[in-house]
A protein has these predicted regions:
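Outer-membrane beta-barrel proteins
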Residues: 54-56, 85-90, 125-129, 171-175
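Residues on the lipid-exposed face of transmembrane beta-strands in outer-membrane beta-barrel proteins
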Residues: 45-49, 61-67, 99-103, 118-122, ...
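Extracellular loop and loop/strand-boundary signature of outer-membrane beta-barrel proteins
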Residues: 48-51, 85-89, 130-136, 165-167
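Glycine- and aromatic-enriched membrane insertion/assembly motifs of diderm outer-membrane
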Residues: 34-108, 157-160
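Cleavable N-terminal export/targeting peptides
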Residues: 1-38, 187
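Mid-chain, well-packed structural core segment of small domains
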Residues: 112-130, 139-143
Length: 187
């Protein structure tokens, strides 16, 4: 898939996720006592497109934890993401373990909550080449990311989201457009 086609495809998915969130019925937000403080508040999954520097676009898969708020509207989200793509006979993959900090911008009376944030992650990048082309290599790199998105708390224990993220990783910068869900534990 070429770069223009992958960006158009990713934008179509993002618009679809936002449309789904805008048409879904929102449930009242959980009481603030349930959402305040740090702790294991929920678990979720994500899927989307990643466009790594110097390679074709591919599917990005991930899992995340809602670790709560350390101040009002500021969330901690530990996560793991993985993608793999073949480029010029070389398979490149990235397993990322990281944590994001997202700031919510609640809209009074609105069902959708925009957010922005950033984070740090360890990227375990691996390149596998055929035996005649040097074999392969692996490296661990520290990455910084920025992101923005929209989330919708559809039910007290289920929320959906769509986000755009850019990872700054040496030699493997990545644009990601993802969507997913978070199941919140109510206790």
């Amino acid at each position: 898939m070429n770069r223009n086609g992958s960006v158009v495809g990713a934008l179509i998915v993002a618009v679809g996720l936002v449309s789904l969130g805008a048409t879904a019925h929102a449930a009242p937000a959980p009481a603030s006592t349930n959402s305040q403080g740090l702790g294991f508040r929920g678990l979720g999954a994500r899927i989307g497109f990643v466009d790594p520097e110097g390679a074709s676009s591919t599917v990005d898969l991930g899992l995340h934890i809602d670790a709560g708020e350390f101040v009002q509207h500021v969330h901690i989200v530990p996560l793991v993401e993985y993608w793999k793509v073949g480029a010029s006979g070389v398979d490149v993959s990235d397993l990322m373990l990281g944590s994001d900090v997202n700031v919510d911008f609640p809209v009074e009376g609105g069902r959708l909550t925009p957010y922005a944030g950033g984070g740090l992650g360890l990227h375990f990048v691996k390149a596998d080449a055929p035996p005649g082309f040097g074999g392969g290599a692996s490296d661990t790199k520290l990455g910084l990311n920025i992101q923005g998105g929209i989330k919708n708390q559809m039910m007290p224990n289920l929320g959906i989201f769509g986000e755009v993220k850019y990872n700054f990783v040496s030699d493997v910068n990545q644009l990601k457009i993802t969507g997913g869900f978070t199941y919140n534990f109510i206790y």
